Amino acid sequence: MTLHEYIEDMRGKRIAIIGIGVSNTPLLELLLAEGIRVTACDKRSREQMGEQAEHLEQLGCELHLGADYLKDLDADVIFRTPGLRPDVPEISACVQKGAVLTSEMEVFFRICPCPIIAVTGSDGKTTTTTIIAELLKKAGKRVWVGGNIGHPLLCEADGMLSTDFAVLELSSFQLMTMTQSPHIAVVTNLAPNHLDVHRDMAEYVAAKENIFTHQSREDIAIFNVDNAITAEQSTRAPGHARLFSRQGEVADGVFLRGEDVVCRSGGHERIVMTTRDIKLPGVHNVENYMAAIAAVDGLVSDQVIRTFAREFGGVEHRIELVRTYKGVRYYNDSIASSPSRAIAGLRSFSEKVIMIAGGYDKHIPFDVLGPEIVAHVKLLVLCGATADKIRAAVENASGYRPGHPEIIDAAPLAAAVQAARDRAQPGDVVTLSPACASFDQFKNFAERGDFFKAIVNGWEE
């Protein structure tokens, strides 16, 4: 099915699009331009939407806004925004009456004419997705990047060729209702996350599994065998399972032997590069490269991989060196919105650091973070709703002694950054590594990271 054919199939149907955000707006405008009747529902008020509300109404859109935006929902086809649970009562009632519940990403999977490579996991998704996409580009492939990064691809599907590649980063929210899987799936790792939205860890893991559950026998799924959850998942993949490991050799996939990154396939193995070739810091980035190599094996030459690894400096907000100020290095790791991500960042430094942590409470445990802070942090500056939980995790950790690390509270984030600056000495490292989401103070992790960078870059020498 092509995009044009899908649009024709929508004619005469009542369409509801829930959430007028980044992923749904291009679809909404496309349908309206085609003369299709669309109702757009958004919990924001008309005042909060500003000129966008008037613009959509001028295009012929019916708007349901504000607290009761789902009241009287009635449609033949409902497009769900990724952040909204599919089982809210209003949607469930509509589905029971025969409505089709879908999403921009689900439709893209139906109509995409080229192979899809998709990445999910708790940590490393964006970096791994970016590495895969950039390697394919360096190898001369035409690549479309979307999902959680890039931009919505559905409206561009008719411009794609069968020889292109679509490379996607997919979240658990996007995957919850997926009934199709990509040609190549990558699961970087799984750890507790987003338990403020998912009922429990089991539902979170089940959502992630949709990235490979619907694959055919000819498709490929790549798993981190060092992670207990993803290692178990690899035994249930319907397609060809490939593994990657930093801790031991694998029969089919990519692994570390000393400093050598080795790819093994069909009984043959080769050294693709060494860990010294990887410019990005941290063992977690070695894992990201191993996952990416397994995904592009046979599509990209080893020379291209080595050259890229030596040059690629990483993705913004991921252990990003902001500035060295008066002998102190300041890093922006705002993407570290969970304990596991924060741990990976802390382990990338050779010295004990000054850590700024805390934020929105996603109802995930911090027990695993406590010992890592004890081992890697000299001063912990806490702010945000989770400050007390993180403090308790550190103080209850094995090996903790009062003052090791020292823990102080400073809120909001601007005050925490100032406190870190006041205490830092030449040679120190200060890292914004929140271990939490940003929604208590910021729109998202990027806005939080930009705020941090603006403060640090604004200091006069």
Residues covered by each model-derived region:
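Residue-level signal for inorganic ion chemistry
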Residues: 31, 78, 119, 148, ...
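Short internal beta-strands
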Residues: 37-44, 221-225, 356-357, 376-385
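Short beta-strand "acidic-cap" motif of Rossmann-like dinucleotide-binding folds
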Residues: 38-42, 145, 167, 243, ...
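Nucleotide phosphate-binding/pyrophosphate-handling subdomain across enzymes
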Residues: 3-14, 24-34, 142, 273-378
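N-terminal leader/targeting and accessory segments in enzymes
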Residues: 1-103, 301
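Phosphate-binding loop of NTP-binding sites
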Residues: 70-75, 82-225, 229-240, 255, ...
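Beta-strand->loop->alpha-helix junctions that form or flank phosphate-binding loops
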Residues: 39-43, 64-67, 102-106, 238-256, ...
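C-terminal helical cap/extension that packs against the catalytic core
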Residues: 53-54, 368-427
